[in-house]
Design a protein with these regions (language model features):
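Conserved glycine-rich Rossmann-like NAD(P)H-binding loop of the short-chain dehydrogenase/reductase
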Residues: 44-58
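Catalytic loop of short-chain dehydrogenase/reductase
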Residues: 147-148, 152-192, 205
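Active-site loop of short-chain dehydrogenase/reductase
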Residues: 20, 68, 99-100, 146-159, ...
Length: 254
């Protein structure tokens, strides 16, 4: 089994994602945006899913201008999305591409940083829907397309508060704990009779808008950029990582 350090230091060859069809959620901002750009750079056709059409269009234009494979724009707000809409999305991808090589579940919201005894139930429900329930529904809706690929890879995005719950992080921490458990269960249910692989990535402290909102007094220049922690996201989508299953991988040494 590869160590986290080996995965972080993996050598990536040009076009290592050539001809792969990969869906990235939360593609309009932060880590999702960077992941999408790098996947395109390494040869993938990227399906850009996010809630803000204008941000997806800007990213689409950027990928096109760089001469990479033409991406697709898939607007969807996880806070409002239904399972029926996700099934419609699956049919659309089936018609256009026929299969799906991977999903990066990156979309997420922070919610409130407050004691659970004071946590607004409506906010709690929204955070759990966006961060936990929607990734489950989307994975289930796209499962058949993943099975049609040679060796599909699903990546969930966790957090340090997913591995170790922390006071005041409420629904966000609980949703990330849930994702790590979901990845583990999917792995146990598929690893012996399919080529599917499920893993979770903990990006660590990264220079994003969400991080700035959670830690407003923190110097952003003290943090790694998404570009600096990108290697595990790319490696786990390559065929070389076909044996990596059920892992929670830290992008930054602890």
């Amino acid at each position: 089994m590869l160590t986290h350090e080996q995965i972080r230091a993996a050598k990536l060859v040009d076009n290592c994602l050539k001809d792969k069809i990969i869906l990235v959620t939360g593609a309009g901002d932060g880590i999702g945006r960077t992941v999408s750009l790098f996947y395109a750079r390494y040869g993938a056709t990227v399906l850009l899913l996010g809630r803000t059409q204008s941000k997806l269009e800007t990213l689409y234009d950027e990928i096109e201008a760089l001469g990479y494979a033409t991406p697709a724009i898939l607007p969807m707000d996880f806070a409002k999305a239904t399972f029926a809409q996700m099934n419609e999305l699956s049919l659309l991808i089936q018609k256009e591409f026929g299969y799906l090589d991977g999903i990066v579940h990156n979309a997420g919201i922070l919610g409130a940083l407050t004691p659970l005894e004071m946590y607004d139930p409506i906010t709690f429900e929204e955070v759990m829907k966006v961060n936990f329930t929607a990734p489950f529904m989307l994975t289930q809706a796209l499962f058949g397309l993943l099975m049609k690929a040679k060796s599909a890879s699903v990546i969930f995005t966790s957090s340090s508060v997913g591995a170790k719950p922390r006071a005041f992080w409420g629904a966000y921490a609980l949703s990330k704990q849930g994702l790590e458990g979901m990845s583990d269960i999917f792995t146990q249910e598929t690893q012996n009779h399919t080529t599917l692989r499920f893993n979770t990535i903990n990006p660590g402290a990264t220079r994003t808008n969400m991080r700035a909102h959670a830690f407003p007094g923190e110097d952003p220049n003290s943090l790694k950029t998404p570009e600096e922690i990108i290697t595990p996201y790319i490696y786990l989508m390559t065929d070389d990582a076909s044996g990596v299953k059920g892992q929670v991988i830290d992008c930054q040494p602890k």
